[in-house]
């Protein structure tokens, strides 16, 4: 059995920087046609020049791949700055509530503040797409739910602004997407295939720790259902986020799951298991093209066959190891060729 996926798109990707970027980028740039690149670096991408420098770094270490760049939402994003970014091809804003995830210490503290709303108004005028890490301070399993009032305010106040709830993790958010025409979402492999049991049901597994947290069986099943039917307001976004094992095994574990090396085979296995392989093309590419208005992307054909694939336990960077999701397991699908 074989399947060919055309122009796979990852609508949420972390490729880090410097040596780590060189070590992990190929896992995404080779099989994927394009990816929305996250701006939460150690020095956030808060303006157009730094964003373009990072884009150049990615392009210098990849080929036939389109990085879709995003700006780190901040109060300094004036109308002039946004116009400059748009002229240079930057179409995405990423809003991080302050302190909610990795490198979000410079995030937005007042989500409904005057300055935040002013930036959003300008973003709407210029046709930007807003991607949001939709969590608010509160009990860890309710953080996304607690952000619903903010999301509703954004959706109603800026009806022409496309708003993406990144890495949807709570089944209660589904109703919001179906209620508001301008609300969309991305789904990760881990949120549609894993639950809290994978993180802490046995021994604590730091390599399954991410934000937003993987949640209950009900959440996983409801979100998986959206993916399997390729809901038209949902696109695939891996949120693949590599960290060194030395940091993952520390007393202060960073959030992030490195899933890039297994994405296409694992999705094939999951969709075949649920008799939904015919919908994988829409989930992995077609929906994103429609939602984000993507055209003239590099052409890619990823051919996968139903043959065993033993997942490596890790990859290397500067003699440090980076653990790969489900490392040591065997998938029933294998990526055979990229053309």
Curated annotation (Swiss-Prot):
UniProt catalytic activity: (S)-dihydroorotate + H2O = N-carbamoyl-L-aspartate + H(+)
Pathway entry: Pyrimidine metabolism; UMP biosynthesis via de novo pathway; (S)-dihydroorotate from bicarbonate: step 3/3
Binding site for substrate: 14-16, 40, 133, 243, 255
Enzyme Commission number(s): 3.5.2.3
Entry's Gene Ontology molecular function annotations: dihydroorotase activity; zinc ion binding
Binding-site list for Zn(2+) 1: 12, 14, 94, 239
The keyword Transcription regulation appears for this protein: no
Cofactor binding mode and count: Binds 2 Zn(2+) ions per subunit.
Task performed by this protein: Catalyzes the reversible cyclization of carbamoyl aspartate to dihydroorotate.
Matches recorded under HAMAP family: PyrC_classII
Protein name: Dihydroorotase
Source organism (scientific name): Helicobacter pylori (strain ATCC 700392 / 26695)
């Amino acid at each position: 059995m074989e399947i060919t996926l055309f122009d796979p798109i990852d609508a949420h990707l972390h490729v880090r920087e410097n040596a780590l970027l060189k070590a992990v980028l190929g896992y995404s740039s080779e099989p994927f046609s394009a990816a929305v690149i996250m701006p939460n670096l150690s020095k956030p991408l808060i303006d157009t020049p730094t964003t373009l420098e990072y884009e150049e770094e990615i392009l210098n270490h990849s080929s036939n791949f389109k990085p879709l760049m995003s700006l780190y939402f901040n109060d300094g994003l004036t109308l002039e700055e946004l116009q400059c970014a748009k002229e240079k091809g930057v179409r995405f804003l990423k809003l991080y509530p302050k302190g909610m995830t990795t490198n979000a210490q410079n995030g937005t503290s007042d989500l409904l503040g005057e300055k935040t709303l002013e930036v959003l108004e300008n973003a709407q005028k210029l046709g930007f797409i807003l991607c949001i890490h939709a969590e608010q301070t509160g009990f860890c399993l309710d953080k996304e739910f607690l952000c619903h009032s903010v999301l509703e305010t954004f959706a109603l106040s800026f009806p022409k602004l496309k708003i993406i709830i990144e890495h949807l993790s709570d089944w209660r958010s589904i109703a919001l997407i179906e209620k508001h025409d301008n609300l969309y979402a991305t789904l990760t492999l881990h949120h549609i295939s894993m639950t809290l049991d994978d993180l802490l049901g046995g021994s604590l597994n730091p390599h399954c720790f991410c934000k937003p947290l993987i949640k209950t069986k009900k959440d996983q099943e409801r979100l998986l259902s959206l993916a399997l039917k390729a809901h038209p307001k949902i696109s695939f976004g891996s949120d693949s986020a590599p960290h060194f094992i030395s940091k993952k095994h520390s007393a202060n574990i960073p959030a992030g799951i490195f899933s890039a090396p297994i994405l296409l085979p694992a999705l094939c296995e999951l969709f075949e298991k649920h008799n939904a392989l015919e919908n994988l093309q829409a989930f992995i590419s077609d929906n994103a093209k429609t939602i984000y208005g993507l055209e003239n992307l590099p052409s890619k054909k990823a051919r996968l066959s139903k043959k065993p694939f033993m997942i490596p336990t890790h990859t290397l960077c500067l003699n440090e190891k980076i653990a790969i999701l489900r490392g040591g397991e065997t998938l029933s699908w294998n990526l055979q060729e990229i053309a």
